[in-house]
């Protein structure tokens, strides 16, 4: 406990707990918060665009991840600072809602805070800056709506969807196969989409991977792939016109629910018990045969004796299948999951045209393909790759492509990429600033400057002089009144993004601006940071 005096000479007591806390107030607090956010944005800035760099992250367990997906980088970074954690949440929110644009949203938030710092140093109140940013974000979102284009597609004409997915995949490691992967992603989304209701359930798309083969071997399977094999090596490897019993109950004689003890003191009693168990299991197998099942898929295991009996009775079985996979199998085959064995009936069986076991390479790895299902609304994207890291990164890339295709089905408006949308918004926001006579005018201009961070980063990452490139494109926007001009990252020779087929979804771009502004406003309103000091 310590004694201190205020400005009037009155004594007051400082408790030991308060002595242990460090405190930042006013402009110092704002600067510390902005510095933390800028540090995170600086890390992600080099990963933006088709020429963006990848990051290698090592977990405490020694697992290595190589990725340029913003949400994944931030998820795996061990961030202590609370403001940095806000940006991690921001990226996760963009990933959850839109699936793409996770790097851009953090870069934009960092640029907005960098501009805000200059205004705060000039003595402008943070609330006025936040209000100016809110006005500017509304102007930018409305402008995006005005420059957007409706992109018509159908179940037969999927080229618009493929082109948009290719834009997403062009910044990933898998960009050399972007055409094939984009087509696979679009076909998978259309298989599970309800185009009339504009509804897509991505849970019906299973993404599975296996080390071996090359990326070009990635395929779309109209059915389900399960990383299991038949329970007995002598069971048939192909079953045509399969009737599948899907069990979540144990495929074995029932055990008493209460504590019990069985006294066996003679060989006869043991043989009676064994015979009873065998008889019970025999009846279970017979019931499966009677209802017409030609394949049993079980969530639980069964012992070797039961397995041998199944093989003898010519009833193929698969054991230890996960709950999520069982659900997908039930949806695909039109079957019902059976929780109690007594409820098994012919109506609850799933139907598939072909169930086959496929082996890979010289290893003993086998997987089960369930194809030609009664209901084709569940599909699997099966990824091949040279190593585990490649497969994991491909899964993340395909997730982004699936989300983009879904967003385009929900709302088929697109804006042009390559930084063209941000440059156009920057010009529109700058022009609108003059219509606001208050201090907010400075914040609106700062917002316009912050929007330039995306095209500047794209140019920088592509090895172009950033400021020179941006000024040329901006003047072209104004002279030609052409909102499609962006940064020519791939050195094609034209900066018209329509000719380069670089598209982004309107809702994704709007969400980026709104989420970044929202988080920046929250950070600007923090003027006091109290943290426990280090021991």
Swiss-Prot record:
Function: Molecular chaperone; assists the folding of proteins upon ATP hydrolysis. Known to play a role, in vitro, in the folding of actin and tubulin.
PANTHER family: CHAPERONIN (PTHR11353)
Keyword Chaperone (UniProt): yes
NCBIfam families membership: chap_CCT_epsi, thermosome_alpha, thermosome_beta
Localisation per UniProt entry: Cytoplasm
Matching SUPFAM superfamilies: GroEL apical domain-like, GroEL equatorial domain-like, GroEL-intermediate domain like
Family according to the record: Belongs to the TCP-1 chaperonin family.
A Pfam entry, by short name: Cpn60_TCP1
Chain coiled-coil ranges: none
Keywords, sorted A to Z: ATP-binding, Chaperone, Cytoplasm, Nucleotide-binding
Main localization (coarse): cytoplasm
Subunit structure: Heterooligomeric complex of about 850 to 900 kDa that forms two stacked rings, 12 to 16 nm in diameter.
Protein name (Swiss-Prot/TrEMBL): T-complex protein 1 subunit epsilon
GO cellular component terms, semicolon-separated: chaperonin-containing T-complex
GO MF term (any one): ATP-dependent protein folding chaperone
Record Gene3D superfamilies: GroEL, GroEL-like equatorial domain, TCP-1-like chaperonin intermediate domain
């Amino acid at each position: 406990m310590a004694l201190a005096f205020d400005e009037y000479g009155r004594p007051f007591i400082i408790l030991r707990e308060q002595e242990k806390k460090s405190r930042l107030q006013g402009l110092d607090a704002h600067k510390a918060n902005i510095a933390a956010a800028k540090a995170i944005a600086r890390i992600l800035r080099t990963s933006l665009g088709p020429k963006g760099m990848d990051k290698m992250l090592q977990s405490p367990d020694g697992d290595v991840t190589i990725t340029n997906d913003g949400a994944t980088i931030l998820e795996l970074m061990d961030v202590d600072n609370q403001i940095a954690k806000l940006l991690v949440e921001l990226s996760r929110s963009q990933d959850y809602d839109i699936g793409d644009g996770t790097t851009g949203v953090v870069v934009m938030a960092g640029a907005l805070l960098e501009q805000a710092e200059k205004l705060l140093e000039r003595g402008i109140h943070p609330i006025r800056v936040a209000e100016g940013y809110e006005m500017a974000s509304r102007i930018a979102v409305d402008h995006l709506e005005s420059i957007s284009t409706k992109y018509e597609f159908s179940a037969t004409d999927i080229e618009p969807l493929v082109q948009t997915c290719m834009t997403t995949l062009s910044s990933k490691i898998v960009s050399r196969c972007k055409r094939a992967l984009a087509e696979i992603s679009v076909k998978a989304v259309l298989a599970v989409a309800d185009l009339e209701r504009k509804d897509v359930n991505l849970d019906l798309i299973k993404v599975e991977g296996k080390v071996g083969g090359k990326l070009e071997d990635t395929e779309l399977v109209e059915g389900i792939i399960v990383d299991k094999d038949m329970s007995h090596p002598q069971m048939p490897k192909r079953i045509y016109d399969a009737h599948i019993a899907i069990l979540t109950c144990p495929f074995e004689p029932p055990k008493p629910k209460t504590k019990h003890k069985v006294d066996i003191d003679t060989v006869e009693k043991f043989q009676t018990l064994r015979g009873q168990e065998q008889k019970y299991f025999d009846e279970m197998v017979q019931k499966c045969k009677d209802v017409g099942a030609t394949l049993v898929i079980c969530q639980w295991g069964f012992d070797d004796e039961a397995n041998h009996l199944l093989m003898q009775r010519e009833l193929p079985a698969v054991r230890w299948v996960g709950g999520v996979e069982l659900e997908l199998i039930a949806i695909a085959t039109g079957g019902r999951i059976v929780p109690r064995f007594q409820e098994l009936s012919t109506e609850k069986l799933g139907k598939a045209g072909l169930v086959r076991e496929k082996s890979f390479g010289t290893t003993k790895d086998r997987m089960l393909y369930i194809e030609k299902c009664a209901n084709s609304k569940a599909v699997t994207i099966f990824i091949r790759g040279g190593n585990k890291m490649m497969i994991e990164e491909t899964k993340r890339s395909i997730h982004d492509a699936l989300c983009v295709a879904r967003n385009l089905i929900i709302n088929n408006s697109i804006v042009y990429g390559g930084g063209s949308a941000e440059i156009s918004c920057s010009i529109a926001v700058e022009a609108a600033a003059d219509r606001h006579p208050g201090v907010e005018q400075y914040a609106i201009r700062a917002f316009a400057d912050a929007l330039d961070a995306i095209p500047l980063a794209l140019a920088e990452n592509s090895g172009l002089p950033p400021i020179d490139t941006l000024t040329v494109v901006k003047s072209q926007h104004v002279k030609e009144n052409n909102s499609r001009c962006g940064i020519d990252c791939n050195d094609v020779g034209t900066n018209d993004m329509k000719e380069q087929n670089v598209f982004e979804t309107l809702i994704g771009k709007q969400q980026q601006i709104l989420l970044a502004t929202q988080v920046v406003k929250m950070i600007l309103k923090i003027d006091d940071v109290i943290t426990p000091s280090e021991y």
